[in-house]
Amino acid sequence: MAVPDRRVSKTRAAKRRTHYSVKLAKPVKAKDGTWKLPHHINKFTKEY
């Protein structure tokens, strides 16, 4: 099992974690004009 040779400083760890943010799904406009999430099936029209 790997063991770190030295402690990672708070600043260095924080710099590494800057890209850990949550990406929100952006809704897209469907053909019928309603908003939906991409890659999800529409309940009413059954379109992908």
From Swiss-Prot:
Protein name, per record: Large ribosomal subunit protein bL32
Similarity comment: Belongs to the bacterial ribosomal protein bL32 family.
InterPro entries (alphabetical): Ribosomal_bL32, Ribosomal_zn-bd
One annotated GO molecular function: structural constituent of ribosome
GO cellular component, one term: large ribosomal subunit
Pfam family of the protein (one): Ribosomal_L32p
Keywords tagged on the record: Ribonucleoprotein, Ribosomal protein
GO biological process, one term: translation
Highest taxon listed in the record's lineage: Bacteria
Gene name linked to the record: rpmF
